[in-house]
């Protein structure tokens, strides 16, 4: 059977497609972007568009699907949102002028990490991450292509890399080295990332600079190379790569941020119910993004924290001026995104109008800040560059009523360009000239119904009905004959028409050229615009924090060097807002310099978790520079927060609750310092009772003796409260309850000392379990309470070689009696679990299990 002949157009498609095998290729053909072969089949299913075929009568018709070019962005967004890449192949010449097949080239590859234009613009950052490795060290760089932000750092291990990728909420990672298969599975299956390979670097001294380490420079250059390879243009809005270190900020894992509901509610995935939702009173898109960053990366430098506090205090002291400031910020558009559109060559007249309006607001904002007359604002005032020459250019050049498109005219203001004004005068006067000709010929010919009309085919013409044809003058010439009338022209009308058409054509071309020149001039200001955007964003965030502080009666925290926590009548900021101030029960939190651990007992649903989260949120708010919900707050500056709060466990990845508990506990124990905060909620619940109790006790002892971090440890193992007798830096607190007439009321108040009951059956009653079941549980509880559990201090365990928990129940058979060493044990010892991800640990254990 003869091989089917491929048309030149389809051969061109195949030649381009082979260079982009991992992307949907949108192939411009006239007014449509077409997809062929497998791309068409998959796209038709995903986008719910019609699947047809090319060469339908052939033995093997080619599957085909298409979308209109003017509405393609919405379809592209769907594909990218689902994690696909999309390559855009445009026609590079006018099809009318083309000889043979129209020349086509891919002009951009849009990926999940490089989205700039979108039919649903989102003010949040969209970070593209790159990772590299030399020896045992990892380099990580990230960029938001839509704003130009660019950063790089070094990390110790792959676990830290994964944590940072999660914190950045990245959707795509560029890999610059040979990735281990197990690591790839973690990135793809657990973190749900699109991986792209890039082994070459892009040498740009201006963007990379010399402030980065060699490894940071390597990973940043590979990220740049990928961006240039996909965007296929020079991007003037990209900022110089900035070095950063994780230790420069309050360290929190993604799990910690999620459990504290910092940026979104962990249960709903929505902004509502998060700290971000509570604090966000920003007026600008840049301010909103910066607020997210401040919440995500609180500071550890006390001087920088106080600098933010000072400005918030100025805003609090000047209510009316602050209100004026907030009102003026409403007139500020997203400068960072506008600058990127200019850089991409996609800025339209509306974009420049928005930029002009924004620049006109800067002097107003600056004047309001100057009216505060406070030195705390001097730095911000210096950064508020109004760019008067750019504002003047835009105001004088762009018509305020200009359309969004750049090919329809009506863009440039009258008076900006002399030649353009001349063409416009011809077009304007031409209309009156035609009216004069019409009146003159009507009178001369005696045809009272004579009028001049226009259409694209015939241009301007005299319309004469058949009944008046005998009156047509000799200098009229016929242009068209219709059923009931004829169309005529004259030399004079043709001359005027020619001048008008020439003026219209030249005007349109000139107006486009002028706009492009103006846009090029705007591009020269991108660096200054980005600096201005940062300053306005900072002002916006600080006024937002002032508003929330005033509205919710927050106080300014102070910091101490004595490792002391003193929060008087503190509140959980988000819970208070949701419940209402009148309903919320405040709690005082006190750790003197000698107290490191609070062991918290009390019923489920009584408020233990809220109490612990209250402290963690107070620390986050204080160290981001915000005010805190309490009557007074005195804190040390923490270097990290480690949590194990299991309410939001996600077991889809195959990890058991207990495995997650142990992994998170391991991270805290391994990384925490005396300057860290540890929050452990019901640690050990994921395994058998006595296993869990033994682990809980040993972890408490380890933190007490080896780590020294401020720790809140909530437990349902009431026996552990006896540890206060042997651990000098541990105190017991519990949630108060009120029992009356057989009914139990949780007071949600934390008081000193251990709880005497757990009230689990009461909680089950609240949940609505059957009465017979509850009565039976009460009987069993009475029997179990007759058994004894004695907690022994660590010293006694070491001296008598007995388990820490001594019980009067049946003992388990020892696993270590008559023990003979198994060679697998040495492999187990050699596992470097501190530098392995949970998935890697589980795979290694599974491998060892096969050898037993």
From Swiss-Prot:
Binding-site positions, ATP: 602-609
Pfam families membership: MutS_I, MutS_II, MutS_III, MutS_IV, MutS_V
Record flagged with keyword DNA repair: yes
Listed SMART domains: MUTSac, MUTSd
A GO molecular function held by the record: ATP binding
Any one of the GO BP annotations: mismatch repair
GO cellular component, one term: cytosol
Annotated keywords: ATP-binding, DNA damage, DNA repair, DNA-binding, Nucleotide-binding
Record has Ubl conjugation as a keyword: no
Role summary: This protein is involved in the repair of mismatches in DNA. It is possible that it carries out the mismatch recognition step. This protein has a weak ATPase activity.
Stored NCBIfam families: mutS1 (TIGR01070), PRK05399.1 (NF003810)
Name under which the protein is recorded: DNA mismatch repair protein MutS
Native source species: Streptococcus thermophilus (strain CNRZ 1066)
